[in-house]
């Protein structure tokens, strides 16, 4: 079930409260020291469902700044599923660790920046980005699928490593 209001989220963790408080600032919200967290670092955990709600907006959520969502150093828990979501501002999740693949199939975004992050896959078939997709120094232990993606900016993979899943592994 998708969250529709902030009330649906329930009790917010400290990193979530901090991000919510800075949502309309246009600046980066930094979890901890902003470096890449270890898996299971609950002090820096932010739920993917909460991020989705912030990106899509809700009546009881502060307005997202025009620069988009800017987060550094979080452990993103759960599946951040933005499939078919349109007109999203920029998404910056730098030096973040994801425990599930990021799903952007048929999404429409301004830009995507995942620099320094670690994730188990990126499903972005038919993604439409007005700007670039920046994956500098990213570690992906799984598939990257950008088939049919339309990028008005650059695709940057400098310093990244991808360990593709075996062909017997089902797609995300």
Report the location of each language-model feature.
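N-terminal leader/targeting and pre-domain segments
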Residues: 1-172
């Amino acid at each position: 079930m998708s969250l529709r209001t902030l009330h649906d989220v329930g009790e917010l963790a400290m990193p979530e409260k901090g991000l919510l408080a800075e949502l309309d600032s246009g600046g980066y919200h930094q979890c901890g020291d902003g470096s890449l967290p270890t898996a299971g670092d609950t002090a820096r955990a932010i739920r993917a469902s909460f991020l989705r709600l912030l990106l899509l907006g809700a009546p009881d959520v502060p307005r997202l700044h025009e620069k988009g969502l800017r987060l550094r150093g979080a452990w993103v828990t759960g599946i951040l599923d933005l499939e078919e979501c349109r007109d999203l501002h920029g998404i910056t999740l730098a030096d973040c660790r994801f425990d599930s693949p990021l799903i952007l199939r048929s999404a429409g975004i301004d830009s995507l920046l995942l620099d320094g992050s670690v994730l188990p896959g990126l499903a972005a078939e038919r993604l439409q980005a007005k700007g670039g997709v920046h994956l500098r120094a990213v570690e992906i232990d799984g598939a990257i699928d950008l088939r049919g993606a339309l990028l008005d900016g650059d695709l940057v993979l400098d310093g990244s490593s991808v360990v593709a899943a075996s062909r017997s592994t089902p797609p995300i």
